[in-house]
Amino acid sequence: VFESLYNVLKSMRNEGYEIELPKSTNELREIVLGGNSGKYGQEANVIERIDGSEIVENEPYLKEIEEVWGSAPGKIQSDGTGVFILGKKLGNVVVGIQPTFGYEGDPMRLLFEKGFAPTHAFSTFYRWMRNSFKVDAFLHFGMHGALEFMPGKKVGTSSKCWPDRLIGNVPNIYLYAANNPSEASLAKRRTNAVIISHLTPPLAKAGLYKGLIELKETVIQYRELADDDSNKKKLEDLIIDQAKLVNFKDFDTIENLWLKILESEDALIPDGLHIIGADLSEEKLKEYDGYLRESHNHQEVNKLLEKLKKQTEVKGITDALNGQFIRPVPGGDLIRSPDIVPTGRNIHAFDPFRMPSLFAMKEGEQQAELLLSKHETYPNSVAMVLWGSDNIKSDGLSIAQAMALMGAVPKFDDYGRLCGAELISLSDLGRPRIDVLMTLSGIFRDLLPLQVRMLASAAYKASLAEEPLDMNFIRANTLKHQKDMNIDIKSAALRVFSNAEGAYGSNVSHLIDTSSWDDEEELADTFNNRKGFAYGLDGKCTKQSELLSSALKKVDFAYQNLESVELGVTTIDHYFDTLGGISRAVKKANGGDTIPVYIGDQTRGDAAVRTLSEQINLETRTRSLNPKWFEPLLQHGHEGVRQIEAQITNTLGWSATTGQVDPDLYDQLSETFVLDEEMRRKLSELNPKASLRVANRLLEAHERDYWQPDQDTLDALRKGADELEDKVEGVGLAAE
């Protein structure tokens, strides 16, 4: 982040902006995150302290904020009598640090909160920027800020909506990853953002390392022997022992193991972090060249590589600051949508009237059958998570998959516009209609209202279809809901669930991040409370927590598609927040039975369906434990260690929500990042606080009984954690 920020500030200064630029990236990081932070007990430098009396006098929405957070100045980013503005003034530019949502100090509010407002600190931050510093423009630097997720209408925001209240009429320029058009669209709709796209980290083949290399060599020897060779049994025993050492357990035959080794070796992984304003090296361009030729022709790849050589992202930012027109471009990931380059442009999404496309319907049908073949019998009900991002980038592939499972297709009017759903006859379908319990991200709900109504229509029509109940699981379950709950069939047929209007996420990830939960049922309750709103034929929502709980009892397995090559299920917390959250909710609803969880992968080449355990093992093998993944991250210093910590925290999130993480993975993560003295020292020097969190997450996994190391390992881990804690206390709060 700070390397990118430094490059942007340097370019702005060269264009005439009055900026007091430090001499280096490290100095910039220190004065922003360190500075006087120790003096005030804050996590970053304090620009200014705003007294509580000033907040009371100047906050126009004080009553609404106090109803949620109590009297000003509140407890967030506060000394009890005032609020701190964090960041650093650099001449005519302020590098500000957006305050947190505020739930971090009281995570149980995630379960019970009915309304919401930003904290005193959050509102004061934006008011200070507008009225005191008098900014001419905001540049939100990097996606996943909190502003666009504040309460209010999903589109056409007004003075009653918090995004409008906070940003006012100040232009909003937003630097955003090119592969996330869905959340970028949300920022456009709710904060009037002009998006400036940037590339995601370059990708590289994972390759093999340490024990994996030796294992592959042994398997090659085994495959070259004749079936009657006396050495074959000895090699087979050796292979099994070697495979255990590198956590290969899920294979039936040596040939199956061989395919899994090749899958690991060929997997694409992020190679470090993307830096705004830095040219791609020749080595990384060669990596791009290698895997792009798998799906694009020679001429296309050559043109693409020429575009990648050009630095356009900083210019996009400065052009926007100068009030120039920023050319639009569809968003997507580089492998599937090479037209996203050159970046530095204003990404947009799709044509909602034609989603899912015909191609997506064909692909979705094939993927649905592949998923069903993974399970031993036809499932009665499937819990499927649908995000906006992967559907926008794939023209609705996941939507098409849900429709295919239900035995339905989209209905289009004479103008080719989506207008509902139609059922496929059972004779054409050739199998039972699978009941699909769909939980949507808040972004899907906001950006794809036509598709929400289409999915609701498909479930409703299937519920009304006069068909044998053993061939129509949707109708069978609807009739049972109707009888057991004494509700009308229209309510009993509801299958599309999400947050209430204006709310986002299940908040399970917030509980995991703060470690402030006692047992897994709290996670299930939080998910149900947040996602218990059903969306019907008219697209409107009603609170249906009891119906959701009833539907969860019937679920045989949970499923979600991967969003992109770059973002695995252990890379970001969104996956366990949604898929993990509903899996835990199913377990509570059905009385404690753990259900299978599957991951669909259509990001590259032939589609695949893996169990969650297989997916986590693959990602841990190719990313977390792979020097080719973590060594480039460490070259980015502070931020790289934070990424490693996030990977381990997300792994813990899967243990908490599904219990489907191999305990041995924690052994290997401990050995790699904490028990190795040289690695521990390096992590601590680069980011003391994040390195301590790595050790504490591993200890938390033990304390929550997700992993039981031997006593020597546990003692060494505790000793390492104590050493890291001493380091943090020794360097003080200014360390970050």
Residue ranges with predicted function:
Residues 1-736:
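Ligand/cofactor-recognition surfaces for anionic moieties
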